[in-house]
């Protein structure tokens, strides 16, 4: 399983391994000509094609989360210099698992954006005073709301880029089943908007027409029908 969430993840390129690698003959020279590489040492793609978002690594929270959930036996730790390009899952991964990954918001982990969003509950009917999760807690906050909450209680919301986000336009899970006829063997599980809150609609590769609603883009305008 491989994942690339807006970060260059390719490492060293072995042109002799034609099964796993394919690269332009002038890749390194282009990097030199554009001031991306000095030509010294190993050519490591993700280090040469620098991505400021990656913060000096070839992964961030999303890559770590997927690898950690699918291959926990590897013992990968956030903060390591680099991660492998892909991992072998500890068990088979079906479409349901992939859909679950796309719904993930790091709930219960150190990156859970709701972990500090608590309220004080006073003592009542013999139950001692305690803290509990705010009924308003959710990982779908807008930037103005996050800023407002942090101005009231500094540090209450520590923003993390989760796998599922409220500003997603659409997401797909593509399933291929070679043992079925071509018309139904391939299916696109399609969801609009937030992957964690939207149902998935199966669109078979043999489909030649979809309902009229699919012909309208609802990203900029609301259509009641």
PLM feature segments, named:
Residues 2-225:
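C-terminus-biased signal that marks the final domain/tail of proteins
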